[in-house]
Swiss-Prot record:
InterPro entries assigned to the protein according to its UniProt record, in alphabetical order: Mur-like_cat_sf, Mur_ligase_C, Mur_ligase_C_dom_sf, Mur_ligase_cen, Mur_ligase_N, MurE/MurF_N, UDP-N-AcMur-Glu-dNH2Pim_ligase
GO molecular function annotations of the record: ATP binding; magnesium ion binding; UDP-N-acetylmuramoylalanyl-D-glutamate-2,6-diaminopimelate ligase activity
Ranges spanned by the short sequence motif Meso-diaminopimelate recognition motif, renumbered to the chain: 414-417
Functional note: Catalyzes the addition of meso-diaminopimelic acid to the nucleotide precursor UDP-N-acetylmuramoyl-L-alanyl-D-glutamate (UMAG) in the biosynthesis of bacterial cell-wall peptidoglycan.
Name recorded for this polypeptide: UDP-N-acetylmuramoyl-L-alanyl-D-glutamate--2,6-diaminopimelate ligase
Gene name tied to this protein: murE
Protein's organism: Salmonella typhi
Superkingdom as given in the UniProt entry: Bacteria
Family membership: Belongs to the MurCDEF family. MurE subfamily.
Keyword Cytoplasm on entry: yes
Taxonomic lineage from the root: Bacteria, Pseudomonadati, Pseudomonadota, Gammaproteobacteria, Enterobacterales
Enzyme's top EC category: ligase
Keyword Cell division attributed: yes
Amino acid sequence: MADRNLRDLLAPWVAGLPARELREMTLDSRVAAAGDLFVAVVGHQADGRRYIPQAIAQGVAAIIAEAKDEASDGEIREMHGVPVVYLSQLNERLSALAGRFYHEPSENMRLVAVTGTNGKTTTTQLLAQWSQLLGETSAVMGTVGNGLLGKVIPTENTTGSAVDVQHVLASLVAQGATFGAMEVSSHGLVQHRVAALKFAASVFTNLSRDHLDYHGDMAHYEAAKWMLYSTHHHGQAIVNADDEVGRRWLASLPDAVAVSMEGHINPNCHGRWLKAEAVEYHDRGVTIRFASSWGEGEIESCLMGAFNVSNLLLALATLLALGYPLTDLLKTAARLQPVCGRMEVFTAPGKPTVVVDYAHTPDALEKALQAARLHCAGKLWCVFGCGGDRDKGKRPLMGAIAEEFADIVVVTDDNPRTEEPRAIINDILAGMLDAGQVRVMEGRAEAVTNAIMQAKDNDVVLIAGKGHEDYQIVGTQRLDYSDRVTAARLLGVIA
């Protein structure tokens, strides 16, 4: 499509439409403007067809709406001079429609998908950083935000709507992006938000308990993640062989690259592979010696913890699979930086080491504590809470993990939303063997301050749950608050 017009946009699905020019594409009738294409989908919370009159009143050029049944697919009506085209299974087609509207941006860059419960953000950031060090103009899309490296704009969801995703990709291409690393959530896969993207590679990090409030059980959660490889254009497949689900998937993906830091690879069983041979943790970070089907080498990194070794190896394997030379990757590896709010370290002379991490699942909290322990000479503190109006089943599990892996536990608030903060804390304490030893302090700023002020200079204080977030949701209010800023101020790193 040289320009955006209704006839060409819908040519694969509907004939006989006028060549009406279209300015922008939107799912939100409130922002629909003159010349726009309004798409009325039936969502989980609202039926967009109810807002067709509002969109027409605002001057839209055309409307695509969910058909009431298969028989109505392709039906064309006119309302007040505005063509309304009805398509069945519109949500499933939306990614392809938006892709055509925005001139297939995923085909105009090297786009890598990263899915899994934990490690998505760090792996995407490492991919973007590393590829940029090798000459690409790189961008990221995900939890922290969307944009070119260094120009990331914060977002609400890990994976935006199908229209948002294509729109953002088109914007990144227009800004000169040649490489993109994108977090792909299970919600995004189930809701077809990335269905029409052409991924150059797709990475699986791991699978552990999360989002069961949405998926119901682990089997459905795994099935949602598997969709990336079973129903999407996934390109090169890079899979973590240290994860039980990953090992199962590798049996169904004969061309995949198997990656391991724990030795779960038999090179004779995998055509392409990469595994750690030796890993040394120290106060400056980690030294990794590895072997692979591309050759061997050694990497020095300032990243903390075993799971970041896994993330780094997954990023390395992905770039090798995409054809980047091993020698160039080794030369640039030491310049990779930790991600904002992901095992991010704050230090000052005579003060405890403070680590801020986004860990908000049982598995992530365990991994964060194990990572911090590797670098801890004194006591290991853990300050954390659990989100309100979310999966209650993980609360006692996280309480048990904090008690087992930390020396001193401080339980506090983390986005209580509309739940009673003390009720959330009680759910966490229920998982502990000796809740009487736990320090409870509802106000998060006070809890973080108290822990850092009481910790000794050889202690490590892990503040888990919020990471990069700069807000606390109490009731329906979004209040300014940042673990990172609080820690930096207390250590005197910033005023």
